């Protein structure tokens, strides 16, 4: 997943729906700064502890709905190079996707456990100036019909 994003050590990224920070902590080793967003308070506390235990100081774990925290980052004019969206099964709210596009982010790595909401959200992003790049299904649950899918989207046009 991180390989798809082609992260650089000068990048500032966002990891939405970050849980206990697993992806954030791996990404933090490759980039300048990670803003990690999670709505579950105990998960944020665990993520902060995980960062401390691993001597990671460039990951900031923010408590709140991704949809709200993104608006706060926009109001602070935070410049972001890439975003990792590990979406819930219901997918993302359209307003959240519009906010991401409004930030001028060049690369979005979208992780989904629901092909239907993935397709819906990809269509929204296409309309917001992004194209679909690499797609990698991941069989995290062998013997079941569940599949995770990792998708790279790249900006090709300004937000509409």
Labelled PLM ranges:
Residues 1-160:
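Rossmann-like S-adenosyl-L-methionine
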